[in-house]
From Swiss-Prot:
UniProt PTM: Predicted to be exported by the Tat system. The position of the signal peptide cleavage has not been experimentally proven.
Domain of life: Bacteria
The protein, known as: Glycosyl hydrolase family 109 protein
Pfam families per UniProt: GFO_IDH_MocA, Glyco_hydro_109_C, TAT_signal
GO molecular function: hydrolase activity, acting on glycosyl bonds; nucleotide binding
Cofactor: NAD(+)
Function, as annotated: Glycosidase.
EC number of this enzyme: 3.2.1.-
Keywords assigned: Glycosidase, Hydrolase, NAD, Signal
Cofactor note: Binds 1 NAD(+) per subunit. The NAD(+) cannot dissociate.
């Protein structure tokens, strides 16, 4: 194992990084420009990278989420873990030890400061980079990854401003490199089964969807020096909107063929009072603790409504503060029936195994028997063994590598990443303007009208 500190191979990118992390975030409430920007490259809809016999992987960030990816990649065939980068020695040591335990060659380690990742990007023996860092680093790291000739795979959300979204789209088109936001929920067994059912017309013509990220995470406020809560807590003091829209919205978007025959048109959003985090801090921390000095402005519950160009509606909710069970809603309503998640249930007028649509059908097994997605039929057992949010993480990474090794287009592209992530910014703009509607940028520049829907991908 080699420990290599910065060589600053991308000196010119320093100004870009600084601008993205500071100026763009503070400008997030500025008026949204909806006119498509002049295209400087070629559309990457359906982009197919040259086949790779072996996919050589670099990891930026191997903390909580990043280490999970390292674990999953160790179970995949046709990959080499070439390098890892992090600023915390403890998580580096953990990742290195795990890779050794799996009898894989030791990766080169990059550390030293926040820009050490550039040394990893300077290598010419890495094909893809997995980015699992605090949110404000996602956009600059993705851009620099593509500029260095590598494909970028980024944790959610992709970006934090409209301008960042455009910069990432433009870079992908100019470099002809993939930039996939790793929305793992799209690979859940239920979500892929519903996608299969939608494609087979079980629910009829689609009308409405409901998506959410309802996940009580106040406990993360106790992560002070390291881990997710050490930085994520502060976003509740900076922005009032839907901070984390993609887990629920990603699957619903694929059901509705967003960016592939339909697209988001406009959004309206409103937030409840921001009370829960201050109350939690008062209860769990000393009066003079920093957590009690913060002003929490993000509403405990944010609700946004999206209208698509075809007239469909989507409700999107965010709540990581109130005490209630986890949910992503995952509801899709069509002219013949509905699927709703948490708990899973179905009601259809025709083709419902004889059950009336006036009552929920909670017995999922017969639906799985008929509509289970081919990916889960093939690797479901392996996914359940290897874990990762019930197996969805493994299926996502397996599918990514399969596409790269077999010359297939990825299931999610940069336009999906930008469209799903930009809800973060647009919801804030709407909330701050008495819930007036905000228009979505068309990141595809009109190409959505002719793009083919995502099929029932196999393997």
């Amino acid at each position: 194992m080699h420990n290599i500190h910065r060589r600053h191979f991308l000196k010119a990118a320093g100004a870009v990084t600084a601008g993205l992390i500071t100026a763009n975030i503070t400008a997030s409430t500025h008026a949204n420009s909806v006119a498509p920007k002049p295209q400087t490259g070629k559309s990457v809809i359906g982009l197919i990278a040259p086949k790779m016999d072996v996919v050589r992987v670099g990891f930026i960030g191997v903390g909580e989420r990043g280490f999970s990816h390292v674990e999953q990649f160790c179970h995949l065939e046709g990959v080499e873990l070439k390098a890892i980068c992090d600023t915390h020695q403890a998580v580096i040591d953990r990742a290195v030890a795990h890779i050794a335990k799996q009898n894989r060659p030791q990766p080169t380690v990059y550390t030293g400061d926040d820009l050490s990742y550039r040394d990893l990007l300077s290598r010419d023996d890495i094909d893809i980079v997995i980015i699992s860092t605090p949110w404000e680093w996602h956009a600059p790291m993705a851009i620099e990854t593509m500029e260095s000739g590598k494909h970028a795979f980024v944790e959610v959300p992709l970006a934090l401003t409209v301008e960042e979204c455009w910069q990432i789209v433009d870079t992908a088109e100019r470099t002809q490199k993939n930039c996939m936001m790793m929305e793992n929920v799209n690979y859940g067994r239920e979500e892929l089964m519903v996608l299969n059912m939608v494609r087979q017309g079980v629910f009829g013509e689609l009308l409405h969807g409901e998506a959410a990220y309802i996940h009580e995470l106040r406990w993360q406020m106790k992560e002070i020096d390291h881990k997710t809560g050490s930085w994520r807590t502060y976003w509740h003091t900076k922005r009032n909107g839907n901070l984390y829209p993609t887990h629920g919205l990603g699957p619903v978007s694929q059901y509705m063929n967003i960016n592939r025959g339909d697209r988001f048109d406009y959004l309206t959003s409103m937030s409840s009072p921001a009370l829960g985090r201050a109350l939690y801090a008062k209860r769990e921390f000393p009066a003079d603790h920093e957590r009690n000095q913060l002003k929490y402005i993000n509403g405990d519950i944010n609700t946004s409504l999206i209208k698509t160009v075809k007239g469909r509606t989507i409700m999107v909710q965010h709540d990581t503060t109130t005490p209630r069970p986890y949910s992503r809603h995952n509801l899709i309503q069509g002219t013949n029936g509905v699927f709703a998640g948490f708990p899973n249930r179905i009601a259809v007028e025709h083709g419902g195994f004889g059950k009336s649509y006036h009552e929920w059908d909670m017995d999922m097994q017969k639906w799985y028997d008929k509509y289970d997605h081919p990916l889960w039929q093939r690797i479901g057992k392996e996914a359940e063994i290897n874990g990762g949010h019930g197996g969805m993480d493994f299926v996502m990474l397996w599918r990514m590598i399969y596409c790269l090794r077999n010359g297939e287009a990825l299931d999610q592209d940069v336009y999906d990443a930008a469209s799903w992530s930009v809800v973060n910014i647009l919801s804030e703009q709407s909330v701050n303007n008495r819930s007036n509607s905000v228009t979505f940028p068309d990141f595809t520049r009109g190409a959505w009208e002719h793009a083919k829907p995502l099929g029932i991908v196999g393997a």
